[in-house]
UniProtKB/Swiss-Prot annotation:
The lineage of its organism: Eukaryota, Fungi, Dikarya, Ascomycota, Pezizomycotina. Mg(2+) 3 binds at D205. It comes from the Eukaryota. This is Geranylgeranyl pyrophosphate synthase dpchD. Mg(2+) 1 binds at D81, D85.
């Protein structure tokens, strides 16, 4: 009997056994993912897609497919992010890998990527898989550079930071809207608006990490400092006075000491870096609103909804969109 003849029956038996006990196996495999899904979130991406659909008007069933794809990818990336960042809290509770272990959590995250891919044929457009692949590559490119800068202790420029964010954070926003555009009769390209929204989202997230009490409750105080991350205010602060190595030295320590982190936050404040964040966010908000207002033919209701979401992504209110 040839090796192929030996392998084929065994594979068939395993597949049949998997189906027979599928529900139990599925629960085990997905446990780290399901734990994360059960944690209360703000569903910002889902709200954004619903808002964009006032313009794109795609069928509800296809919108739900795209929402599932983005939800799976987003949560898969969070599972991996928490491992790569050595995080301890997610949405105020222990991270998945603290409960299920690193190996099982990585497997669940990878499984979620393929669950998302499995949804693509339901969109009935051969271009959808290309969009899916392009934006997942972008996401990993951005994440790769973020990790590299952190681990090599290299402070990027703001331009390099924005390129990374456009790939890492903007990737899922773009994926959602690009898939929606494939299913829409509208020929308008909303990607430029989505790109600006991705920047708003990440700059705000970086700001809140060091300034928000709500963020402290959900993720821990100054988590970016403990991680050693070159976030937007940290980049500005370091580059505002390159001869002062205090902040860059603190980042290398991966400190959990609250007093040291408070010292770092005070230093970042002293270099005007939080004010720089606020000004940058205001400029990005103005860009996004200008793009929206320049779209002819859209109803005032649609503009109102989008402006509300832009406000949610900005500094107004206490929303923490992670």
């Amino acid at each position: 009997m040839s090796p192929a003849e030996i392998i084929r029956p065994a594979a068939k038996v395993q597949l049949m056994d998997s189906k027979a006990h599928g529900n139990n196996h599925e629960e085990i495999i997905r446990a780290p993912l399901n734990y994360l899904l059960d944690l209360p979130g703000k569903e910002v991406r889902s709200k954004l897609m619903s808002a964009f659909n006032q313009w794109l008007r795609i069928p509800e069933e296809k919108l739900e497919v795209i929402k599932r794809i983005v939800m799976l990818l987003h949560n898969a990336s969070l599972l991996l992010d928490d491992i790569q960042d050595s995080s301890t809290l997610r949405r105020g509770l222990p991270v998945s890998h603290s409960i299920f272990g690193i190996a099982q959590t990585i497997n669940a995250a990878n499984y979620a990527f393929f669950l998302a891919q499995q949804e693509i044929p339901k969109l009935e457009d051969p271009r959808a898989f290309e969009v899916f692949t392009e934006e997942l590559l972008n996401l990993h490119r951005g994440q790769g550079m973020d990790i590299y800068w952190r681990d090599a202790s290299i402070c990027p420029t703001e331009e390099e930071y924005f390129t990374m964010v456009s790939n890492k954070t903007g990737g899922l926003f773009r994926l959602a809207v690009r898939l929606m555009q494939l299913a829409s009769e509208s020929d308008r390209d909303y990607v430029p608006l989505v790109n600006v929204m991705g920047l708003i989202f990440q700059v705000r997230d970086d700001y809140l990490n060091l300034q928000s009490t709500a963020y402290t409750k959900n993720k821990g105080f100054g988590e970016d400092l403990t991680e050693g991350k070159f976030s937007f205010p940290i980049i500005h602060s370091i580059r505002s006075n390159p001869s002062n190595i205090q902040l860059s030295s603190i980042l290398k320590q991966r400190t959990t000491d609250v007093d040291v982190k408070l010292f770092a936050v005070a230093y970042i404040e002293s270099t005007g870096s939080f004010e720089h964040c606020r000004k940058t966010l205001a400029e990005l908000m103005a860009q996004a609103k200008a793009i929206i207002e320049g779209m002819e033919g859209d109803s005032s209701e649609s503009l109102s909804v989008m402006n509300q979401i832009l406000t949610m992504l900005g500094l107004d209110g206490n929303e923490v969109p992670r």
